[in-house]
């Protein structure tokens, strides 16, 4: 079958409907799937000693623990909730801002297409974790306030999800201070950025595997 690369060039490649049918040994596996499929891929990677780049999101805490404590000790794993370089920069920026705006109320708003399954997005949680770790892991994550009957606490961080249309991905982190606010936003207009980021991760992971 034919399929297009991120650069819009067309290549002929064998496509398998089951990972167990693959005859060649890959140098690195890239996983853009869903948590239920990832563990079959991890099992295959472990059995064949193949490094893996995991770009899938939606893992719960126990699944993440299994990946980190069981599989990562046996094979090289590069795992990220977002393959965008600019999201990495955003994470650094908001962490720095959090140290300077310690009295600010922090809210995160993420927007994605109507077909996205997990909520909130893995990227939103990653951004929240960056801020929380910077502030000593003292923040409470609040995902919905419809049942809240009290004033906002200064030890919480709000995380909100919006779903609609074909929006690829938008993440905003807002710092609310007295009489002013500061908002940092990252907006994705093409999924090509994820492919480029994944290929950079492949290069890094492959080199690590051969150190």
Predicted features along the sequence, with ranges:
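Structural detector of well-ordered beta-strand residues that form the stable sheet scaffold
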Residues: 16, 53, 76-78
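ADP-ribose/adenylate-binding Rossmann-like module
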Residues: 44-61
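Hydrophobic, well-structured mid-protein blocks that either form specific transmembrane helices
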Residues: 71, 78-113
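N-terminal glycine-/serine-/threonine-rich beta1-alpha1-beta2 phosphate-ribose binding loop
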Residues: 5-47
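Rossmann-fold NAD(P)-binding glycine/threonine-rich loop
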Residues: 57-76
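Single conserved hydrophobic/aromatic residue that forms the stacking wall/gate
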Residues: 1-7, 11, 206-211
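Active-site-lining helix/loop region of Rossmann-like oxidoreductase modules
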Residues: 16, 98-208
